[in-house]
């Protein structure tokens, strides 16, 4: 489930997912649709997917807000145990849902490390040093096993 179609953030996240899927031939994407970053649009989209009768093993969302919109849909359909829900951002609500088992996982993006690296690169540029055009700060998959480390 994507964010708003055409937005840079949606494109970046989906591009990363697509790169992983290319290396995963056993994974079949059954549905893709825009949940527009929130539960309000995510819930009816998930309802439509479930109503199709197609087999769904997981719903992977571009953020925790959409994932949290999917959770009650699965509960009311009695599918919480069969269909795993994944989010991104490791919000407080998302982390609580992982801890309770409502979500299988979320991805922690270290914004502080990103900002620190951006300022480091800025200082290097100001000093006349060459910097890479892109730098990736590692993300962490947060599951039931490590969620307590990320909860506030």
Give the location of each predicted region.
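A residue-level marker of the well-folded mature domains of exported/periplasmic proteins
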Residues: 1-152
């Amino acid at each position: 489930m994507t964010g708003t179609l055409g937005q840079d953030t949606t494109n970046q996240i989906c591009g990363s997912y697509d790169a992983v899927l290319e290396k995963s031939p056993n994974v079949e994407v059954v549905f893709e649709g825009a949940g527009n970053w929130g539960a309000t649009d995510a819930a009816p989209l998930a309802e439509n997917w479930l109503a199709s009768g197609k087999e769904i093993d997981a719903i992977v969302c571009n953020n925790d807000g959409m994932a949290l919109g999917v959770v009650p849909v699965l509960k009311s359909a009695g599918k919480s145990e069969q269909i795993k829900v994944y989010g991104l951002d490791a919000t407080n609500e998302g982390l609580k849902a992982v801890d309770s088992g409502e979500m299988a996982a979320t991805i922690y993006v270290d914004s502080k490390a990103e900002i620190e690296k951006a300022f480091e690169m800025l200082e290097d540029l100001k000093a006349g040093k060459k910097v890479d055009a892109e730098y990736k700060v590692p993300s962490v998959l947060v599951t039931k096993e490590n969620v307590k480390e990320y909860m506030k």
